[in-house]
Curated annotation (Swiss-Prot):
It is a peripheral membrane protein. Heteromer of 6 alpha, 6 beta and one gamma chain. Transmembrane segments: none annotated. Keywords: Antenna complex, Bile pigment, Chloroplast, Chromophore, Electron transport, Membrane, Photosynthesis, Phycobilisome, Plastid, Thylakoid, Transport. Contains two covalently linked bilin chromophores. (2R,3E)-phycoerythrobilin 2 binds at C139. One of its GO terms (cellular component) is chloroplast thylakoid membrane. This is B-phycoerythrin alpha chain. It comes from Porphyridium purpureum (Red alga). GO terms for biological process: photosynthesis.
Amino acid sequence: MKSVITTVVSAADAAGRFPSNSDLESIQGNIQRSAARLEAAEKLAGNHEAVVKEAGDACFAKYAYLKNPGEAGENQEKINKCYRDVDHYMRLVNYDLVVGGTGPLDEWGIAGAREVYRTLNLPTSAYVASIAYTRDRLCVPRDMSAQAGVEFSAYLDYLINALS
């Protein structure tokens, strides 16, 4: 699984060298931010059901046509699948926060997602809207500390950019 630490070590090993001072500084910064990442992961895990519901509701409010016949949310089963997908992405963001890297999203969430959604006629813009809603709804310090919010938002931005 990719993280700052595994990336630095892999690059150093591939070059047949020890990690450089800048490599170690990068790792140090990552470790210093770990408390904020873990706070964000804890807050997300503790509120994930509400986060997913609000994100999904916002998506269907913005893209009401998705509930029309022939669309991605034409019946309750398909609507539930959309909420399930949002939940899946939030779990992967949580895992990214825990490991301190984008490995979980890269390996389990992004690789091939656009192609799958295109094949199934599911608009990625709807998922992007739900994730952006979560990012934009975040309120510091109500939801988490400022640094935890920065860490959480960074992974949401990464996911938004990957699906866009």
